[in-house]
Every structure is written in structure tokens, then in C-alpha cells.
Amino acid sequence: SLYRYLGGTHALKLPALLILAADGTAEETEMDFRELMLVPKGISSVQGQIRAAGEIDSLFREALKKRNGREGEPDRKKQDAADGGVLKLLEKAVEEAGYQCGKEIFFAVNAGAGRLYEKQSGVYRFPAESRRCGQRVERSREELIEYLTRLTGEYPISLLEDPLYREDREGIQELEKKLDSLNEDDILILAGSIPKSLPQDTYE
């Protein structure tokens, strides 16, 4: 079991929780990434992590309502359009709740790139961003790598899941090189939902 693999009662330190903050399939979120999660790994107790997540989530929901309620502000809508706009709202909610981004609270991003990828044309389409911008937004592999690299430089992202089409091993390697050049060696990149290095029965 996972509990046994992590050391059971003898574990020195348990992993931080990953707490869902934004679901890309929810209408109110209006983002293209599959999921954004809070990683409160700078808070020592599980109770403290859960409390922080609740406080942040409440402020984040209010910020989303305000963003989605804006009408007749095309420039502002473009500014808020990308998934980076949702990350900015989440970062602001963390700070307003009294926590420190990059010290107490980090983010995990499940880009879910496979659902954005159009195999025939070889580009990634961003429908939510396109709607908010009023024009089609699509990115090549190189453009998506640059986009993800920029986001990890601007926000305290500690995990990137499915950042590119899963069969694009060359692209994953290029992304890893980009992050290494930024000294972002603390970021874990998962090209699938379960790392292959873990024992097969870990998640049973």
C-alpha cells in the first residue's frame, strides 16, 4: 500500500497534500489547464495545511466571481484570459489569506496537454483563452514550452503534470532543459499520472 511504501508509522516526513483549487472543466474557472492545485508543503501540520487551503479557496472563489462578472472590459478580459490569469488570482488569494507563496504555499499544475493537442496539425488549442481574447489562440510545441517556462518563473509551481502530449518525449526533455537553465530544479515533471519509478503496488 502507499502508506507502507511511505514508511508507515516509521515515516520521518509525509508528503504535502495536493488540494484541488481550480478545475478546468468547471464553467466558473474558464481555463484550459485541467487542474490547478495548492501544495502547502511549507506548513508542517496536516491540520494547518487543510485550514490554509480552506481560507485560500474562499478568497479565490470570490476573485473568480469578480473576474467573471466583468462586462465591457475587453482589455481587462485579455489580461485575465490565459491560465496565467487564474494563477495570478490564486497567488493573490494566498497573499490575502496571510500566507507566503514560495515558502508556505506552492502550486501544482496538471496541464492536461493531451486534450489540447491536435495531432493532425501538431498544435495545442486553447479554447477558453480564445473565448476571452476574442481570437483563436494556439501554440506550437516550442511556444507551449516557452509559455510553461514563463509561468514557472512567475509563480511558485512545484509540480507540472502532463505539460505536453504524452508521446512527445523530445519536448519533455526540452522543457526540462529550459527549467534547468532557470535553476528550477525543484520542479517535478510528470508525463503521466503515476511515476514509473514507484513500485507497482504503491497505489493499490
Regions found by a protein language model. Give the residues of each.
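Buried hydrophobic positions in well-ordered alpha/beta secondary-structure cores of metabolic enzymes
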Residues: 1, 23-25, 110, 160
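Structural signal for hydrophobic packing residues in well-ordered secondary-structure cores
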Residues: 1-2, 6, 10, 40, ...
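Mobile "lid/hinge" segments at catalytic clefts and subdomain interfaces of large enzymes
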Residues: 5-76
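Catalytic core of soluble alpha/beta enzymes
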Residues: 73, 77-78, 84-204
